[in-house]
């Protein structure tokens, strides 16, 4: 259909969701504040938002024992969201709540899993010093039958199947539009390399998390197969959580990370993470195939030390991203196999807001990661990393959702599929803050009225054939990101291009 002169094409519309509070369903599996939440949801709806995102906690739903799922509180919540005319993005939260930036609630993974970990702590990610991290199960146990007859992947699958079956009415009605599948700490596809619970503070480089016995055994087999059985994982030369790159043998310029052994380790470490994501999303695709719903995975925004030659903080988190090697496009290629969306974070951040000593570059990181997704022809969505209520942050997010601006003749070539704002709170709903937020929502929608027709997921198709390591390696070849405008063409305090 030809564009109508003077009318903004609907293809410029970017859906806007708001994250619900972490404990909206509490640790006792109760939805306690129905009246308060209903009032807040009505304000969100009146503000023009399209929907909400909510963590669906494994530690709440399967708390009583294996396959003993209780969805009653979440059904109450979803019914209320539907009543208020909002769509739902549901996170399959297989991680612990608590221990990360912004966590004001504590919800552990199921207690019966933790009890297995008491006897076998190697089910958890482990650093070189032997410290265990109970936020999420090690990818080393993905296929280990250690959980009362099930593997970790089977537990994730069974949880998602139960969600699908118990929320079938919401899925069929189109109320649930996105399923974000947790693949690591904080629900992100990453290693828990920077845990505040173990003393990490920004901008520490973090530590590698591959010293549980299952990952160590995998490493030993990998180096043996490569004919280098004497190669070892990084030792103390990789430093500790709060080191800077230049203080370490591994990450300093021309450090161990550039040697053959260092490159082999980083390739192995990052590939294990991608394969983990691939296996989890394979299960998710099988569960939700044939439904009108998007599946997604979130990638962490490790923006500190991006401007250091070694990208140390990215490397410890599992993103092998250095000059001439793209650490994110292989992830996008893996997601493309499953018809999944790449969800990224730190969209609100500007380089100038970061401390110089952190060599942080969130703007360049966002540009690289979003470009990687678009080059693999997948949908890209995102969120802010920290709560912000100011025009500067909103305008940065508006720039990133349409990096080359609106297109008056149809959909822009570069456009994010949606943005989720972190987070619904009393601060957001404070009068002045919410008035500016409503302007932000309007600009996300390209000055169009809220449109349910803009949110219509296609039927999820079955995953494509398995991806080979060679195909992943081909995706690491560095290429320039797409160009970005310097500023958004639709600022919160400005007009639209038709005015």
Swiss-Prot record:
Substrate binds at residues 55, 95, 103, 298, 303, 345, 384-385, 423. InterPro entries: Glyco_hydro_14, Glyco_hydro_14_CS, Glyco_hydro_14B_pln, Glycoside_hydrolase_SF. Optimum pH is 5-6. Keywords: Carbohydrate metabolism, Glycosidase, Hydrolase, Polysaccharide degradation. GO terms for biological process: polysaccharide catabolic process. It comes from the Eukaryota. SUPFAM superfamilies: (Trans)glycosidases. Belongs to the glycosyl hydrolase 14 family. This is Beta-amylase. It comes from Ipomoea batatas (Sweet potato). It catalyses: Hydrolysis of (1->4)-alpha-D-glucosidic linkages in polysaccharides so as to remove successive maltose units from the non-reducing ends of the chains. The gene is BMY1.
